[in-house]
């Protein structure tokens, strides 16, 4: 059972 990641992961630029 996979849980959708929300909010989506944010990568620092």
From Swiss-Prot:
Keywords: Amphibian defense peptide, Pyrrolidone carboxylic acid, Secreted. It is found in: Secreted. It holds the Pfam family Tryp_FSAP. InterPro entries: Tryptophillin. Coiled coil: none annotated. GO terms for cellular component: extracellular region. The modification Pyrrolidone carboxylic acid is found at residue 1. GO terms for biological process: defense response. It comes from the Eukaryota. Expressed by the skin glands. Belongs to the frog skin active peptide (FSAP) family. Tryptophillin subfamily. This is Tryptophyllin-13.
